[in-house]
Amino acid sequence: MTTSIIERIDAWAEKTPDFPCYEYAGTRLSYKELKRQSDAFGSFLLNTLNSDKEKPIIVYGHMSPLMLIAFLGTIKSGRAYVPVDVSMPVERIEQIKKAADPALFICTEELPSNLTITGCPVLTQDQLMDALEKHFEEVPDPAECVKNDDNYYIIYTSGSTGNPKGVQISQNNLVSFSNWILQDFSLRQGLRFLNQAPFSFDLSVMDLYPSLLSGGTLVPLDKTITANMKDLYREIPAQNFDVWVSTPSFADLCLLDDNFNQENNPNLTRFLFCGEVLAKKTASELLDRFPDAVIYNTYGPTEATVAVTQVKVTRELIDAYPSLPLGVIKPDMRLHIVDQETGEILPEGEKGEIILIGASVSKGYLNEPEKTDQVFFDYKGYQAYHTGDSGVIKDGYLFFQGRLDFQIKLHGYRIELEDIENNLKKVSYIQNCAIIPKMKDEKVDMLVAQVIPSSHDFEKEYQLSAAIKNELKEFMPAYMIPRKWIYKTEFPLTMNGKIDRKALNSEVNK
């Protein structure tokens, strides 16, 4: 059982010093080098920054070994890190920087030319490399390291106001998650883990820390590979994965290739899914193609440290239910289904809100006490969280029944529809709008924008759509931009004068 994340990772530098903790495209980082360089960086931070450890450190980059070094070095200096991926639009990065109020902004890659960081020190990639060289062989005092209920990382998720919220995950939260994953999923030493998700997305925690804690190798498929289907299909068998961690949507993409099977990936014997609904069709096809593999379906919000339920998906399970269960709760957590209005705990078989209680639950949102109090609460001495997810328990399994609000999962990203709508309303060509998720195979397939446009000079609707998307990409991530656009002169309204979203939903999901 792990009690200190850093101690256990550093121990591999003694046990298997030359074994790669990271390997991709000719770049290889050993456990010995990971310890040595993260020690150097932790020493640099302790020598450079003041003693106030409440402020986190932003680490900007994309799935590189330098990010791992920066993460662990930051932890060794006693501070939490905030991962920010290069794919984020400039405006989003500025929002996160403002909300996090960091002690330092670290660049493991060059910043976009139109982004200027003000209000905190910036460490460029060259300065980072100089710091690693200057403090080489220095070892930070272990007493300075993040411990217990100290924040370990802070991941920013979509917020209903259009501003992201920083979810604080402590060392205790991460220890609880990691011990559960390593034990319940039988992850032995030295396995090769797929890293599909950028580090700014909490699904990445499901491969990053189980890999490092078990003496495994993290093997990323970065955006240059995943953006090109031919490259992706060529790269997967070449990387010789043992453990597959991804969203179901990414697996669906890979299943389009007939060569994605056990014969071409003989070591691939574990699939771990999180981030969105796993459709029966996807699970069934994976069982057909990978007869030696075990498939796990998991569930959990960012606010409860990645995942808190799991179930092994078998043929019998697929045949037994209309949709796949999310599984059973991890041992140090409790789960209740409650009536949304009264808060009363509901019996098995009745649908209500999923409430999570226990060791995995975050302390709340960074610098956002009001938003924290809205969804986090104390339950008999334990931290608890209102997920906003609707669920039901049948035969001891949790089943997902959709969102209680306008929050959805698309390709593993958690998105608040209000966030998109608020951003769309900034566009000069839009007077009013509503975002409707288009469903397919029990999950969100794409986002449809229903728009009342402002006056414009475009002759064709596709020209208007192109102009809107061109404005949107300046301040909204690509995964949040709707794929389909429907233009209207007015919206249907409910009795109380609100947009009739049920009517719009019926139109989109006929």
Curated annotation (Swiss-Prot):
Annotated protein name in UniProt: D-alanine--D-alanyl carrier protein ligase
Function: Catalyzes the first step in the D-alanylation of lipoteichoic acid (LTA), the activation of D-alanine and its transfer onto the D-alanyl carrier protein (Dcp) DltC. In an ATP-dependent two-step reaction, forms a high energy D-alanyl-AMP intermediate, followed by transfer of the D-alanyl residue as a thiol ester to the phosphopantheinyl prosthetic group of the Dcp. D-alanylation of LTA plays an important role in modulating the properties of the cell wall in Gram-positive bacteria, influencing the net charge of the cell wall.
Keyword field contains ATP-binding: yes
NCBIfam families: AA-adenyl-dom (TIGR01733), D-ala-DACP-lig (TIGR01734), PRK04813.1 (NF003417)
Pathway: Cell wall biogenesis; lipoteichoic acid biosynthesis
GO-annotated cellular components: cytoplasm
Similarity annotation: Belongs to the ATP-dependent AMP-binding enzyme family. DltA subfamily.
Compartment(s): Cytoplasm
Organism lineage string: Bacteria, Bacillati, Bacillota, Bacilli, Bacillales
Short name of any one Pfam family annotated for the protein: AMP-binding
UniProt key word ATP-binding: yes
Main location: cytoplasm
Residues involved in D-alanine binding: 202, 306, 498
Binding of ATP, residues: 157-158, 297-302, 389, 498
Enzyme Commission code(s) on record: 6.2.1.54
Entry superkingdom: Bacteria
Catalytic activity: holo-[D-alanyl-carrier protein] + D-alanine + ATP = D-alanyl-[D-alanyl-carrier protein] + AMP + diphosphate
GO biological process: lipoteichoic acid biosynthetic process
Record's keyword terms, sorted: ATP-binding, Cytoplasm, Ligase, Nucleotide-binding
